[in-house]
Amino acid sequence: MSKSYNQRQRKKLHLAEFQELGFLVNFQFAEGTAIETVDETVDRFINEVIQPNGLAYEGSGYLHWEGLVCLEKIGKCDESHRETVKKWLETNGLQQIEVSELFDIWWEYPTKVE
């Protein structure tokens, strides 16, 4: 039997209505891509996809990027967020794009995109 938590406890533990869903994203620039192009593309990714959709991106890389996408506020990403990110990466010439399934970012963080 699962333990019953009050609202304060659920908020602290990110459970039930406070659960946060996100997804991992990996992508790669073509070998030899100039650093200026990488910077410009990542800036556009944030300005055109992440911020307008109320998302947050925590990631890093040079030619190969990997990171976590979640909502800026407490909440749950959905399939439309995954598809929007994936489509933008595809239409902007990035390679080896991987977008994970949605997962609980506090309790189910995967070690890699599956």
From Swiss-Prot:
GO CC entries: cytosol
Family matches, as InterPro entries: YggL_50S_bp
Pfam family, one: YggL_50S_bp
UniProt family annotation: To E.coli YggL.
Record's protein name: Uncharacterized protein HI_0341
Lineage: Bacteria, Pseudomonadati, Pseudomonadota, Gammaproteobacteria, Pasteurellales
